[in-house]
Regions:
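Short secondary-structure boundary/capping segments within folded domains
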Residues: 24-27, 58, 281-285
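N-terminal capping/small domains of soluble enzymes
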Residues: 18-21, 28, 39-52, 334-342, ...
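Conserved, mostly hydrophobic/aromatic
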Residues: 15, 38, 69, 125, ...
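Active-site anion/phosphate-binding pocket segments in diverse small-molecule metabolic enzymes
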Residues: 179-364
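Generic N-terminal amphipathic, Lys/Arg-enriched alpha-helix
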Residues: 1-10, 14
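Alpha-helical packing segments of well-folded alpha/beta enzyme cores
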Residues: 15-18, 22, 184
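Short glycine-enriched loop/turn motifs at secondary-structure junctions
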Residues: 2, 92-94, 317-320
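Active-site-proximal beta-alpha core segment in soluble small-molecule metabolic enzymes
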Residues: 7-9, 31-183, 187, 191-192
Length: 364
């Protein structure tokens, strides 16, 4: 079955432009970029574009995406950016050159798997500096584990240390956080008697320090995805005004109109909960013209944050497979069969690219 809509258009020329802008600015400050493709379900075309624009390494959180990219000819080095489970280690060693790690038991099991496969594997050991996701909270323990890797795990190479910020705890990357990571790296280097190759200062949110010129010297690696793919987190979410060298229109979502009618805006009857167990609040605006699109929460997650590309359209809600749009004020009189376009946020992109029934079209 060939499905035309919903359709996600990917403008590779915009992604290449964003990648060059980000990677060049990082390189000027001595920082290598790992191009992260988890936000697009590891689309090989996007991974290839990042690689061609200077990403020395590619990263994602899911091994299936690495396998798909390798099968499409997008080789390594690959970095696994989600700390792996013990059950995943055979594929980690088989598919990735490097992984993030935060548990001694996993590192010991990784050594055993490397022996079985006759390979070596590089690791970046993670520090938790307050965001409270992965990483060592006790820094003495972290130093001890890094020394253990260096001296007792011959098939596991201690490539460096890293941190994650913002993703869970919303904690901002600051020069002080980066200095704390550099101090941990220095302690480890003193114990092992050599320089660490990688001090990885975080993801897209840490790019703010590159943009502002406040990234401390010594941070030499960032894991960047959203800022290349969409460029919205920092420009829209953080309100950074002078980052307009990054375009935010690389992805366009198109959906088909399947019903247009004038209807009340306030549901009629006794209220319970909606299909997702919630109790929405409705505003009575009288009778208004509404369109239903063949697109739902199963496709993009939160519908209300979709950004219509057309004036006079407002997403007012929906369900798993339906998106309800107020079109009363739309200059174009929408009819059944018409197509509506949206810009996306990162969460929409995560959903849409992982749906097999959304057609993906690449341009430029």
């Amino acid at each position: 079955m060939v499905r035309k809509y919903p359709q996600l258009e990917v403008d590779l020329s915009i992604l290449r432009s964003n990648a060059r802008q980000v990677i060049t600015r990082c390189q000027q400050q001595g920082i290598r970029v790992c191009g992260v493709v988890k936000g697009v379900d590891g689309l090989p075309e996007v991974a290839r574009a990042m690689r061609l624009c200077g990403a020395e390494e590619l990263g994602t959180s899911r091994l299936e995406q690495v396998e798909r990219c390798r099968a499409a000819g997008v080789g390594g080095p690959w970095l696994l950016i989600r700390i792996p489970g013990l059950s995943e280690l055979p594929d980690v060693v088989r598919l990735c050159e490097t992984s993030l790690q935060s548990e001694r038991v996993t590192l010991d099991a990784l050594e055993e798997e490397c022996v079985l496969q006759g390979k070596t594997h590089r690791v970046i050991v993670m520090a938790d500096l307050g965001d409270l996701r992965e990483g060592f909270w006790d820094k003495d323990e972290m130093v001890d584990v890094c020394v253990h890797v260096e001296r007792e795990l011959p098939h596991v190479e201690l490539a460096g240390v890293g941190v994650n910020l913002t993703c869970y705890g919303s904690t901002k990357p600051t020069p002080e956080k980066m200095q704390a990571l550099l101090a941990i790296a220095a302690r480890i280097e003193k114990h092992i008697g050599r320089k660490l190759e990688i001090v990885s200062g975080g993801a897209t949110s840490s790019y703010t320090l590159v943009h502002w010129g406040t990234m401390p010297a010594g941070i030499n690696h960032l894991r960047i995805g959203e800022n290349i793919l969409l460029g919205k987190d920092l420009q829209v979410g953080w309100g950074i005004q002078d980052m307009d060298y990054l375009r935010m229109d690389g992805f366009t979502l198109r959906a088909e109109v399947v019903e247009v009618r004038e209807k009340p805006t306030y549901p009629i009857g006794e209220f319970a909960i909606d299909a997702f167990g919630r109790k929405p609040v409705y505003v009575d605006r009288g009778i208004r013209r509404r369109a239903i699109l063949a697109l739902g929460r199963a496709d993009v997650g939160e519908l209300e944050s979709l950004i219509p590309r057309e004036a006079g359209l407002t997403v007012i809600g929906g369900s798993s497979d339906h998106c309800i749009v107020d079109v009363e004020d739309c200059p174009r009189r929408l009819e059944v069969g018409d197509i509506v376009e949206f810009s996306l946020c990162y969460s929409h992109l995560l959903y849409a690219t992982s749906r097999s029934d959304i057609t993906i079209q690449f341009v430029n």
